[in-house]
From Swiss-Prot:
<comment type="similarity">
    <text>Belongs to the UvrC family.</text>
</comment>
<dbReference type="InterPro" id="IPR047296">
    <property type="entry name" value="GIY-YIG_UvrC_Cho"/>
</dbReference>
<keyword id="KW-0742">SOS response</keyword>
<dbReference type="GO" id="GO:0003677">
    <property type="term" value="F:DNA binding"/>
</dbReference>
<dbReference type="GO" id="GO:0009380">
    <property type="term" value="C:excinuclease repair complex"/>
</dbReference>
<dbReference type="GO" id="GO:0009381">
    <property type="term" value="F:excinuclease ABC activity"/>
</dbReference>
<dbReference type="InterPro" id="IPR035901">
    <property type="entry name" value="GIY-YIG_endonuc_sf"/>
</dbReference>
<dbReference type="Pfam" id="PF08459">
    <property type="entry name" value="UvrC_RNaseH_dom"/>
</dbReference>
<dbReference type="InterPro" id="IPR001943">
    <property type="entry name" value="UVR_dom"/>
</dbReference>
<dbReference type="InterPro" id="IPR038476">
    <property type="entry name" value="UvrC_RNase_H_dom_sf"/>
</dbReference>
<dbReference type="GO" id="GO:0006289">
    <property type="term" value="P:nucleotide-excision repair"/>
</dbReference>
<feature type="domain" description="GIY-YIG">
    <location>
        <begin position="12"/>
        <end position="87"/>
    </location>
</feature>
<dbReference type="GO" id="GO:0009432">
    <property type="term" value="P:SOS response"/>
</dbReference>
<keyword id="KW-0228">DNA excision</keyword>
<keyword id="KW-0963">Cytoplasm</keyword>
<comment type="subunit">
    <text>Interacts with UvrB in an incision complex.</text>
</comment>
<dbReference type="InterPro" id="IPR001162">
    <property type="entry name" value="UvrC_RNase_H_dom"/>
</dbReference>
Length: 551
């Protein structure tokens, strides 16, 4: 624990202070008056301040010229070191980005993490939209999505033969590949007219060459691209690239408009000032920056570090989009209140020991007694947390009750039990879960829903609720999510086993060819029905004939 004597020589000037324990960063803060701010920490009036001082063994102070410099330096250090007690924009961890790596021949990927190097575009709201966007753009420009060491690749993969990758592994023309990467950057920065013009040029070229197959391919890509953008709802007449920020009760909402299209609606809950939020949100962004930030919030900043104007004069469409942002904030708070009230109601109706702020749900899925899987889904404050979902392989168990007991032993010998466990099933499943918890010496509330009748089952009672009851709807949403996750994984295990037994028995089909075939055709049945000529282009005449013979 630090002694208050470390403050004797601290200046009263503005600056940044760093609490550390050895090499671990405990807390980083800024102050207009360093001595006054640090004295407040050492008064130990707040629990957080007490923990910071108790867990630190050193204090560093950096003096700067003014409060704005302190704000920027604080954001820089927090982004770099991610201290234990600093408030981060954690909601941002769940939003997806499109990343272009910094390799000599860059690859592209969808990721939720910004820990790697490279150029990031986003964040986007919806993972499905993000993946589809990258899939379409990858086919248009031919950039690679594989992460392989290109120097170890002997020949191009199937993507090259399908003309969806320029195959930088051939090392033929770096300028052409980097031009494709630059085109991709341009589109991801919001220049959607560029990609439309690019596709139309390709269509016209192939049409003139009487290559109608490729002309049709680019026509379909253009239609797919336009259809995907139209799913975003708001499309403006102009091609602005603007961020609209609404703020209320420590919740920030950012509407990202790029190329006149509303690409993202991003919520962040953080106990930060408006200026602190701006620095945390925009710090580290080297691309995908707006031309301006529009907000009703008063700010001491005329522009942030990247020279982005703030609070410029608003036109009618600016006001319209800010009104949309604030309406969404209202709905956010309304939904939050409803979830909180529903959790309280769940406690009362089910007779729980405490409000179930954390609910974990499980469902057992199998295929005729094989590929048995337990899915785990997590809801916190009534909101799903997909990043904490897990799947547990249980082998070939046909007994539903024993599967539940095995899952609980696997999960809760290593992890803390939640406020409430949901199991998909009735009295038998609930009792099996309770028995397993008793074996572990844990007293955990368990609830299930019997299929078809929608009868709610707890340790001591069984009852029905009206179809529109919020408690029933919440439990059903958890059940449906567990069911979806379990079935998707069990199905993938079945497919994996099936492909092993079929393709691996064919001479000449190794892991690489198998991967190529399944990526192209998705299933054994599709491979079986594929034209011989088409298969020959992918795996050669000899292997294509063998596929036809064996399948």
């Amino acid at each position: 624990m630090l002694d208050k004597s470390v403050l004797y020589n601290v200046s009263e000037k503005p600056g940044v202070y760093i609490f550390k324990n050895g090499s671990e960063y405990i807390y980083i803060g800024k102050a207009k008056n360093l001595k006054r701010r640090l004295n407040s920490h050492f008064s130990l009036k707040e629990e957080k301040s007490r923990l910071i001082v108790e867990e630190s063994n050193s204090l560093e102070v950096i003096i700067v010229k003014n409060e704005k410099e302190a704000l920027l330096l604080e954001a820089t250090l927090i982004f770099k070191h991610k201290p234990k007690y600093n408030i981060m924009l954690k909601e941002g961890e769940r939003y997806p980005y499109i990343r272009i790596s910094d390799d000599e021949y860059p690859y592209v990927e969808v990721t939720r993490s910004r820990k790697s190097s490279g150029i990031f575009f986003g964040p986007f709201t919806n993972i499905t939209f993000t993946r589809l966007l990258l899939e379409i753009l990858q086919k248009i420009f031919g950039v690679r999505t594989c992460k392989k060491d290109l120097s170890k690749i002997k020949k191009p993969c199937i993507e090259y033969h399908l003309k969806t990758c320029l195959a930088p592994c051939k090392f033929e023309n770096k300028n052409i590949y980097m031009s494709a990467i630059n085109n991709l950057k341009k589109v991801l920065s919001g220049d959607f007219e560029f990609v439309k013009d690019y596709i139309e040029q390709k269509m016209n070229y192939h049409s003139k060459m009487l290559d109608f197959e490729n002309a049709a391919k680019y026509r379909d890509l253009l239609l797919s691209f336009e259809k995907l953008l139209n799913t975003q709802g708001v499309i403006l007449n102009d091609k602005r690239c603007v961020d609209y920020i609404a703020y209320s009760k420590k919740v920030f909402l950012v509407l990202k408009v790029r190329g006149g299209v509303l690409l993202s609606k991003l919520f962040y809950e953080a106990n930060l000032s408006f200026e602190e939020f701006l620095y945390q949100f925009y710090y580290g962004m080297k691309s995908d920056l707006p031309t301006k930030i529009v907000t009703f919030e008063s700010s001491n900043l005329n522009k942030i570090e990247f020279d982005i104007p703030i609070n410029v004069s608003l036109d009618d469409s600016d006001r319209y989009l800010l009104e949309i942002a604030y309406e969404n904030l209202k709905e956010h708070f309304k939904a939050k209140r409803l979830r909180r009230d529903t959790l309280k109601k769940i406690k009362e109706i089910l007779g729980l020991k405490k409000i179930p702020y954390r609910i974990e749900g499980t469902d057992i899925s199998h295929r005729n007694g094989k590929f048995t899987v337990a899915s785990l889904v997590v809801f916190e404050n009534g909101v799903p947390k997909p990043e904490e979902y897990r799947r547990y392989k249980l082998g070939d168990i046909l007994d539903d009750f024993e599967s539940i007991r095995m899952f609980i032993r696997k999960r809760y010998t290593k992890h803390e039990a939640p406020d409430l466990i949901f199991v998909d099933g009735g009295r038998g499943q609930v009792n099996a879960a309770i028995e397993a918890f008793n074996e572990l010496g844990l007293d955990v509330d368990v609830v299930g829903i019997a299929k078809k009748e929608e009868i709610i089952v707890t340790k001591n009672k069984e009852f029905k609720l009206k179809e529109n009851d919020e408690v029933l709807r919440t439990l059903i949403s958890i059940r449906d999510e567990t069911h979806r996750v379990a079935n998707s994984f069990s199905g993938s295990l079945k497919l994996k086993n099936y492909t092993l037994s079929k393709l691996d028995d064919i001479p000449g089909i190794g892991p690489k060819r198998k991967k190529i075939l399944l990526k192209k055709y998705k299933s054994i049945e599709n491979i079986k029905n594929a034209p011989l000529e088409e298969l020959s282009k992918i795996v050669g005449n000899k292997i294509a004939l063998r596929l036809k013979e064996y399948l």
